Amino acid sequence: MPTSTSPPVDSSLVHGEVVFDETGRSFSGATVYVRLEDVSRADAPARIVAEQILQDIAHTAGTATQLQFALEGAVPDERARYAVRVHVDVDGDGQVSRGDFLSMESYPVLTYGNPNNVTVRVQELR
């Protein structure tokens, strides 16, 4: 029986951009956490493989704000599933809370034919 895996991947380099929802409110001084996560285990928390932290980020409501990112971790397991997740910590408390911006969709990368370049849209948590 054939297995459902992708060809081997040489590196877990993932790059792309974070795009803010234009309807979200203005802010400044935020910290953005961009994480590459192993999301293979259905009933367990995702494991962080790589993280980039962007500090002192600002966004003006009604404008298109884009941030570039690059994440690199160990060579990925071709049988695992990976995704990029973004949390924009507006209030600086280190927790996901109302007023922060989050990626609300899954952004799979690296294995199973998924890309290594993604555009991650974030929306304000209301």
Protein language model annotation of sequence segments:
Residues 43-52, 98-104:
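Short beta-strand and strand-turn-strand segments in soluble, beta-rich domains
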Residues 2-7, 107-126:
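Extracellular beta-sheet/turn segments enriched in Thr/Pro/Gly and aliphatic residues
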Residues 20-22, 38, 90:
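Short solvent-exposed capping/turn motifs at the termini of beta-strands
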Residues 76, 87-102:
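Short acidic/polar inter-strand loop motif in beta-rich domains
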